[in-house]
Amino acid sequence: MHRQAHHRSGLDRINQAAYRRAGVLRQYETASGWLEPGEQAAVMLAAKDVRGAPVLDIGIGGGRTVPLMRAISDDFCGIDYSPAMVAVARRRFPDVDIRTMDARDLAFPNRRFALATFSYNGIDSVDMPGRLLILAEVRRVLRRRGRFVFSALHRGSMVNLPHWPDWEVFHDAGLQPGRLFRATARLLAGGINHLRGLGLVRDDGDVAVASLSAHNFALLAIFMSLATQIRELHEAGFAVEAIFAPDGQRIPPDDPADDGAPWHHFVARKVEARRGYC
């Protein structure tokens, strides 16, 4: 085991603040089941080789994935870097091993787990140096040929994303004063959230940082092209076994056409150890 130093970037501060908000916590507390067919397909593909073996669930939020992962193995540990989220998950699952921990600095020995998962595009919520630390740490704690299943936002979908100002907030308001007031307040709050992260927004073509309409533009995230994501995994010591679109359609890793899907689910395998790797 080793400890790594990392600083909190502006993106970190914005996102961690969002994850402490009561409204966000309530949404995560009630989430359950598979998000979509693509998520289920990716996890089930990896699960075939790791049932009963140790599982690490990163970024568990309010605990949505806990029953899903424990159906694969009782040797389970869930982590999240948000103490508020961990408190929610522990209330829901008091007998489960759930810890406050940052994926950039995993407090586990080398080769501890057979499977690591990171759902909800959580890997996109840290900056690029942090993202590479996560991949290195996940690889370190995985066993030989261990699997890493995660979802990541797709650069090719950004043209279809809602942007602030999002006038859709007035769609159901009609002419009712109360609804109009709430819609206006939401629009203005979204504008404040958007401006808070505006200095971090960028677009380098294959990689971009943008605000998400989720939680009223309170979150910033990285968007990456499929080819860039695959290259990043290869350079981090993983082989890409499968990619799934949200609807469950499988995308060939060796010919990754940039479709318009908002995100993809990846199944990556830890490659054979090389000098300098665990």
Residue ranges of model-derived segments:
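SAM-dependent methyltransferase
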Residues: 151, 155-232
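Core SAM-dependent methyltransferase catalytic element
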Residues: 253-278
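A short acidic, Gly/Pro-enriched loop at the edge of an enzyme's catalytic core
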Residues: 104-116
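A short glycine-rich, Lys/Arg-flanked "PGG" loop and its adjoining helix->strand segment in the class I
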Residues: 132-144
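A short SAM/SAH-binding and catalytic strip from SAM-dependent methyltransferases
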Residues: 115-129
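Conserved class I S-adenosyl-L-methionine
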Residues: 1-61, 64, 261
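Class I SAM-dependent methyltransferase SAM/SAH-binding core
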Residues: 62-105
